[in-house]
C-alpha cells in the first residue's frame, strides 16, 4: 500500500479443523490482481501447503496471467514429518512462472542482516524487478550478510537440527497447556 498498490486479501477458511485456501474466493479475486504473494509455508499459521494446493494456486495464477511470488523464507522450519515443496517444482509450466524468495534469516537467526535471495524464472522478469527495486530504493545484500548466509547454509545443519528440537518442545508445551487449561484453543 505504501508503494501505491492495492492489497486484495484471500482469507483462509477452516475445513475439518484445519485452515486452508478459499479456492472459490481465490479464483474470483485472481481476475482482479497482477501479483499473488504466497507465503509457503504459511506464516504465522505454519501451514505446509500440499503439492495439490500449490498446483491449484499456481494454475489459477497462470490462467489469469497473475505473477506468482512465493515467499519460502520459512521453508526450513517445518515440523511433524511434513515436507516443504518449493512452488517452482510443482510442474515445468509453473517453474517458468514463479519468482521464489528464500533466505536463511529466519532459520539461522540472521534477520538483522537483511539478506535474501530471489530466484527468477527468466532474465526479463529479473530485469523488470531490478528496475522496480532501484526505483523503490530497496536495499541489497551486503558483503557481511552474503558471507553470513553462505556460512549458515554450508555449516548450519547442526544448528538447524537443534533449533527444530527446541522449537518442537515449545510447540508441545503450548499444545499441552492449551489442551489442559484453554481447551477452546485448538493447537
Task: Please give the residue ranges for each predicted region.
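PLP-dependent aminotransferase class I/II
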Residues: 97-180, 184-187
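Structural detector of well-ordered beta-strand residues that form the stable sheet scaffold
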Residues: 8, 69, 99-101
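Substrate-binding/gating loop at the entrance of the active-site cleft, primarily
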Residues: 1-7
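Active-site phosphate-binding strand-loop segment of PLP-dependent enzymes
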Residues: 12-82
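Substrate-gripping "pore-loop 1 plus following alpha2 helix"
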Residues: 81-85, 95
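A short helix->loop->beta-strand "cap" motif at the edges of active sites that frequently abuts
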Residues: 5, 63-67, 95-96
Amino acid at each position: 500500500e505504501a508503494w501505491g498498490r492495492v492489497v486484495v486479501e484471500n482469507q483462509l477458511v477452516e475445513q475439518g479443523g484445519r485452515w486452508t485456501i478459499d479456492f472459490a474466493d481465490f479464483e474470483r479475486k485472481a481476475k482482479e490482481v497482477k501479483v499473488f504473494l504466497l507465503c509457503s509455508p504459511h506464516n504465522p499459521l505454519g501451514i505446509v501447503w500440499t503439492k495439490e494446493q500449490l498446483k491449484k494456486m499456481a494454475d489459477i495464477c497462470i490462467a489469469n496471467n497473475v505473477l506468482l511470488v512465493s515467499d519460502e523464507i520459512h521453508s526450513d522450519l517445518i515440523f511433524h514429518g511434513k515436507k516443504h515443496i518449493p512452488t517452482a517444482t510443482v510442474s515445468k509450466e509453473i517453474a517458468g512462472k514463479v519468482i521464489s524468495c528464500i533466505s536463511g534469516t529466519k532459520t539461522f537467526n540472521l534477520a538483522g542482516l537483511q539478506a535474501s535471495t530471489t530466484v527468477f524464472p527468466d532474465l526479463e522478469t529479473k530485469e523488470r524487478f531490478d528496475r522496480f527495486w532501484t526505483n523503490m530504493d530497496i536495499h541489497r545484500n551486503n558483503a557481511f550478510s552474503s558471507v553470513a548466509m553462505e556460512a549458515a547454509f554450508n555449516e548450519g545443519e547442526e544448528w538447524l537440527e537443534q533449533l527444530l528440537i527446541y522449537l518442537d518442545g515449545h510447540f508441545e508445551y503450548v499444545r499441552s497447556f492449551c489442551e489442559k487449561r484453554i481447551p477452546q484453543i485448538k493447537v
